[in-house]
Amino acid sequence: MKKEINYLFDVDGTLTPSRGIMNSEFKKWFINFACVNNVILVTGSDRNKTIEQLGESVYKKCKRVYNCSGNDVYEKDTQIKYNDWELPIDVKQWLNFKLEHSPFTLRTGLHFENRTGMVNFSIVGRNANTQERKEYYEYDCKTNERIKIAEAFNKKFPELQAKVGGETGLDIFPVGCDKGQVLKDYDIDSVKFFGDRCDPQGNDYPISKLLKPTSVYHVKDWQHCWELLKNV
């Protein structure tokens, strides 16, 4: 008997542009795909942001949605898991020091965004517009600032983890509360995963490292994801 496949997707940078909304043509195609396949989402963003990016039509076609890296889980409109956490004061002080001393001087506000079970930290800030996000992303690609902060953080606070997420942020959470926790709900051999941050410092890595290489589709952007899906 053929094993049923569970298609697991990151959202930001995989199904959508970073912090942007889903392309309308891709959305139509993806809804049809979700009608005949088991589609599961796992994202660092909260429920409201995910719906803003994808639209309710896509969100509700999915079998299950793991928001906040699997700490806030929904099936349609029903919440089935909620695992909250608060950033310790000494950890926030350490991150504030990094914020104050970053050579990248542009600040837009909302540098700490509390989400269920995790915190997103951003040097440029979550209020950055598209151009400001691009400027920081280009700077980060040259300097690896986020990777360096994550590596130092993980040595300083071994009970916590920092992972690069999206174009400007770091996802921070207790050890074991990353995206990898969602695989406990599935037969690993049944999963095909699509994500853009599958590198060791990325927030998709906790999933990709647990799967066979042939079950991981490391995408460049949503166009690449769509192209791969057409040939699955």
PLM feature segments, named:
Residues 1-2, 30-36, 54-57, 97, ...:
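Alpha-helix C-terminal capping segments
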Residues 2-3, 23, 173-232:
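Mg2+-dependent phosphoryl-transfer enzymes with acidic/Ser/Thr/Gly-rich catalytic loops
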Residues 3-21, 41, 183, 204:
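Asp-based phosphoryl-transfer active-site loop
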Residues 18-19, 50-53, 76-77, 130-131, ...:
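Short glycine-/acidic-enriched loop or helix-start segments at secondary-structure transitions
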Residues 21-111:
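Active-site phosphate-binding/coordination module
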Residues 66-69, 166, 220-223:
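Residues at the C-termini of beta-strands that transition into short coil/loop
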Residues 105-192, 198-200:
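Conserved acidic, metal-coordinating active-site core of Asp-based
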